Amino acid sequence: MYRLLALVALASMADCSALLTHITGTSIPGQLFINRQFLAVNPDGAVYGTIESDNVDTIFKRVAVDRNRIVIQNAITCVYLCMDRCGQLYGSKTLSKDCFMREFLEKNNYNTYYKVYDRKLTYVALKNDGTPRKLQISKSRKLGKLSVYAMALLKRLSFPIYTSCPNIKSEIIVRHRKCHV
């Protein structure tokens, strides 16, 4: 009797897990689609937007470091997406304070990626031409019409990616880049 109940429970769990395949962890590779283009980071650190979905610079993995912070890393070149205090986006091969971001799931199922500096939210955003946009608003304001530049969709890859990137350690390195105002 107990074996039959255990068998039925296992079968129902297998059915449920098949229905929940869209819910996956943060380290699954994918592409971030922001403002009608894919976010890309060159190995030399340049951040840009492209419409080419087969570009290797657009394949990222989001890794949860702790409850409130994630790191966005290129799954092929192992370059981290970072943002300095001025809101400038850049890529870095070394992990620093600038590379830790927050992710927020909006009501419309889009994600926003941001950092908090001096009571201001600084978002990962792209202009219409694909260049990074500095988008910084106070904590009390809503994104509103500026959300076009910062709302991101995560497109999961339909094929497996095997990376040779080292594991991310949660220790924080000093700020990587000085902000020049």
From Swiss-Prot:
Gene name of this polypeptide: FGF
MF annotations from Gene Ontology: growth factor activity
InterPro entries per UniProt: Fibroblast_GF_fam (IPR002209), IL1/FGF (IPR008996)
PANTHER family in the cross-refs: FIBROBLAST GROWTH FACTOR
Name listed for the protein in its UniProt record: Fibroblast growth factor homolog
Family, as annotated: Belongs to the heparin-binding growth factors family.
Signal peptide, first to last residue: 1-16
Matches recorded under CDD domains: beta-trefoil_FGF_Bnl-like
Annotated organism of origin: Autographa californica nuclear polyhedrosis virus
Alphabetized UniProt keyword annotations: Growth factor, Signal
